[in-house]
From Swiss-Prot:
The gene is psbT. Signal peptide: none annotated. Coiled coil: none annotated. This is Photosystem II reaction center protein T. Belongs to the PsbT family. GO terms for biological process: photosynthesis.
């Protein structure tokens, strides 16, 4: 169960960093 929690936290942190970089730059993909 601990491994599942660690993987969840890892994916969560990576997701937050990805969204931070994505929203920081102008979203060209939408247009």
């Amino acid at each position: 169960m601990e491994a599942l929690v660690y993987t969840f936290l890892l994916v969560g942190t990576l997701g937050i960093i990805f969204f931070a970089i994505f929203f920081r730059e102008p979203p060209r993909i939408v247009k």
